[in-house]
Amino acid sequence: MAASVDPLVVGRVIGDVLDMFIPTANMSVYFGPKHITNGCEIKPSTAVNPPKVNISGHSDELYTLVMTDPDAPSPSEPNMREWVHWIVVDIPGGTNPSRGKEILPYMEPRPPVGIHRYILVLFRQNSPVGLMVQQPPSRANFSTRMFAGHFDLGLPVATVYFNAQKEPASRRR
């Protein structure tokens, strides 16, 4: 059997956070001029503001975007898995998260120790969910799978992840 070269499998996004899925939508993510590709490294200082996210699709389709860190507080002991950084629902296709309803405001990456994975997951909604979704009581111990199941979102339609680690104090500004 050949080894998988899918970066979501190699990076353990499939398994730790998501089940295997077939991408059916396009999502492009940028922090400033930096285009995010699976497994790339981003300095936390470049991710202070929410990324620019463009979603393909038709305006009559609605999407949910979730961003989590499955490595909180540390990759070797992720006992807060997953730490949720952002939730936006009811995003019209062909637009971006600013057109949706923000359930949980964006929180920039703050990896305390080790290399953390930050995962942006896009789901296609069957109907509007904005009135049903509440802000989680805590950012810790969120489950993307349980969230998707609770709101009948099914499998993701697109996902991208990046890595980040704590920057030396002299570089943070």
Swiss-Prot record:
The biological process GO terms on file are: abscisic acid-activated signaling pathway; positive regulation of seed germination; response to abscisic acid
**Assigned keywords, A-Z:** Abscisic acid signaling pathway, Acetylation, Cytoplasm
Q: What is the lineage of its organism?
A: Eukaryota, Viridiplantae, Streptophyta, Embryophyta, Tracheophyta
Which species is this record about?
Answer: Arabidopsis thaliana (Mouse-ear cress)
- State the signal peptide span: none
Q: Which GO terms describe its cellular component?
A: cytoplasm; nucleus
Instruction: State the protein's name.
Output: Protein MOTHER of FT and TFL1
Query: Is the Acetylation keyword given for this protein?
Result: yes
Record's family?
Belongs to the phosphatidylethanolamine-binding protein family.
Disrupted-gene phenotype:
No visible phenotype under normal growth conditions, but mutant seeds show hypersensitivity to ABA during seed germination.
